């Protein structure tokens, strides 16, 4: 792969000591050596390009003393410098606590064999090979081609074979002793699938400047992050799926996106929830006249729905008024008679019975809705010469007509009262004070009543 051309090694060459295994809490572990990817190429300024005892002698000469090492990483294709202190007191084997072998780091990441499926009870299963996470990186002999491993297996039929295996889950290398056996009862001599080539290389993590190397001892009890290769560069979790909706629905989606689900309901729903009727109400002028009307009796009904007896006021002090008959010719069509007594006035005392020929009994109006015609009750309607219910629909009253009706009633009271009674005079004075401008209609009605009485 030409890794030696990517970085210039002091002293030249592409050889070094390949780090296969790093023991936890060892001097090599504390120095940050990474298994499989690191190659020790120099120590204390001495280039290690030959397989001899130079490394051992340098380590023994610097026991319990820090020395500098130059390390080449096949992962990052860079050189780095590390300080290590050889020691016999750290509690493990060796001065550094690492397993190494002398080899070339040129193409170290390419000459690997990926362990695929492992058959049960096969030589590979008995040796402890793990499917898909194990990579055979070498043996005691040099292997630079894909056929080198298979040739080595054939020459070790029924004989123990030592292999160096790197595991991506543990991020460490180990020695595996396997005995090839073509008669194990399955296919092949190992009973496992072997992959070689670009698609079966060890996945590497991108190098980050200043990144601290994590070792197996530091990964205890923590989940292992999957490594990435050339086919896992895309992070599927961060990719937004493309829109699958037809192009024609884009405008509809944009218009619907502006709708607010939490918007306030229309004002109509608020009106309906409060119980306000939605039918047309009375004209504004009628509403103004009704603003001062006292509260309605709950038993009363609308004027168009008969009867209204439940809403009529109780006037027990006027029993004799039913004997009076108003002259029919003087009732004005289309005009309703308002009430005689307003709220706050004292009740009228009882008047002596008097029968005036040609005058119908005076009906009693209601205390509310003075703009609608009133309907007489049972016996009063039977005795009346001309029932008011047969009259045409009446419009809203005007003040002059209401004053005329009140003046007519007061004048009639004056004609029939006895000279000794003074209470009706009080009623006449109150009515006349309220309507001083209507003197002429009052006198006309009084003359007509006097002529009729005579």
UniProtKB/Swiss-Prot annotation:
Residues covered by region (Important for membrane binding): 194-199
Q: Locate the Dimethylated arginine modifications and list their residues.
A: 30, 47
Instruction: List modified residues, type Phosphoserine.
Output: 214, 411, 443, 451
Which cellular compartments is it found in? Golgi apparatus membrane; Endoplasmic reticulum membrane; Golgi apparatus
The UniProt record lists the PDZ GRASP-type domain at 15-105, 111-199
Highest taxon of the lineage = Eukaryota
Question: Which post-translational modifications are recorded for this protein?
Answer: Myristoylated. Myristoylation is essential for the Golgi targeting. Palmitoylated.
Phosphothreonine: modified positions: 222, 225, 435
- Which keywords does this Swiss-Prot/TrEMBL entry list? Differentiation, Endoplasmic reticulum, Golgi apparatus, Lipoprotein, Membrane, Methylation, Myristate, Palmitate, Phosphoprotein, Repeat, Spermatogenesis
Naming one, the record's GO cellular component terms include: endoplasmic reticulum membrane
* Function noted in UniProt: Key structural protein of the Golgi apparatus. The membrane cisternae of the Golgi apparatus adhere to each other to form stacks, which are aligned side by side to form the Golgi ribbon. Acting in concert with GORASP1/GRASP65, is required for the formation and maintenance of the Golgi ribbon, and may be dispensable for the formation of stacks. However, other studies suggest that GORASP2 plays a role in the assembly and membrane stacking of the Golgi cisternae, and in the process by which Golgi stacks reform after breakdown during mitosis and meiosis.
Q: What is this protein called?
A: Golgi reassembly-stacking protein 2
Q: Which organism is it from?
A: Rattus norvegicus
| Lineage, highest ranks first | Eukaryota, Metazoa, Chordata, Craniata, Vertebrata
Gene behind this protein: Gorasp2
């Amino acid at each position: 792969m030409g890794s030696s051309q990517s970085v210039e090694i002091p002293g030249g060459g592409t050889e070094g000591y390949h780090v296969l295994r790093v023991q936890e809490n060892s001097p090599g572990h504390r120095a940050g050596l990474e298994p499989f990817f690191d190659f020790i190429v120099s120590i204390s300024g001495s280039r290690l390009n030959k397989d001899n005892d130079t490394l051992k002698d340098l380590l023994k000469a610097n026991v319990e003393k820090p020395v500098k090492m130059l390390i080449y990483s096949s992962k990052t294709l860079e050189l780095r410098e590390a300080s290590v202190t050889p020691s016999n007191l750290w509690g493990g084997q060796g001065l550094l606590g690492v397993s190494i072998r002398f080899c070339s780091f040129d193409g170290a990441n390419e000459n690997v064999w990926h362990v695929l499926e492992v058959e049960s009870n096969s030589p590979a299963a008995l040796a402890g090979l793990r499917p898909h996470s194990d990579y055979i990186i070498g043996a005691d002999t040099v292997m630079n081609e894909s056929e080198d491993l298979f040739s080595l297996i054939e020459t070790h039929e029924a004989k123990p074979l030592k292999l160096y295996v790197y595991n991506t889950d543990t991020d460490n290398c180990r020695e595996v002793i396997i005995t090839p056996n073509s008669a194990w009862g399955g296919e092949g001599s190992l009973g496992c699938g072997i992959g070689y080539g670009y698609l079966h290389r060890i996945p590497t993590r991108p190098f980050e400047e200043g990144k601290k190397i994590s070792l197996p001892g530091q990964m205890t009890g923590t989940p292992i992050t999957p490594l990435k290769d050339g086919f896992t560069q895309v992070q599927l979790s961060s990719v937004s799926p493309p829109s699958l909706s037809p192009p024609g629905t884009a405008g509809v989606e944009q218009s619907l996106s502006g709708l607010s689900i939490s918007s306030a309901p229309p004002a109509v729903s608020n009106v309906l929830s409060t119980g306000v009727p939605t039918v047309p109400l009375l004209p504004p002028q009628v509403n103004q006249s009704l603003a001062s009307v006292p509260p309605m009796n709950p038993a009363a009904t609308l004027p168009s729905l008969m009867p209204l007896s439940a809403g009529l006021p109780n006037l027990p002090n006027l029993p004799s008024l039913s004997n009076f008959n108003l002259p029919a010719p003087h009732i004005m069509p289309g005009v309703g008679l308002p009430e005689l007594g307003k709220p706050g006035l004292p009740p009228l005392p009882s008047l002596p019975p008097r029968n005036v020929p040609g005058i119908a009994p005076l009906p009693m109006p209601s205390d509310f809705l003075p703009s609608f015609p009133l309907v007489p009750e049972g016996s009063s309607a039977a005795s009346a010469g001309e029932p008011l219910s047969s009259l045409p629909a009446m419009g809203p009253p005007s003040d002059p007509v209401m004053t005329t009706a009140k003046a007519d009633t007061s004048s009639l009271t004056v004609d029939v009262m006895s000279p000794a009674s003074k209470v009706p005079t009080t009623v006449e004075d109150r009515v006349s004070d309220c309507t001083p401008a209507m003197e002429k209609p009052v006198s006309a009605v009084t003359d007509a009543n006097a002529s009729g009485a005579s």
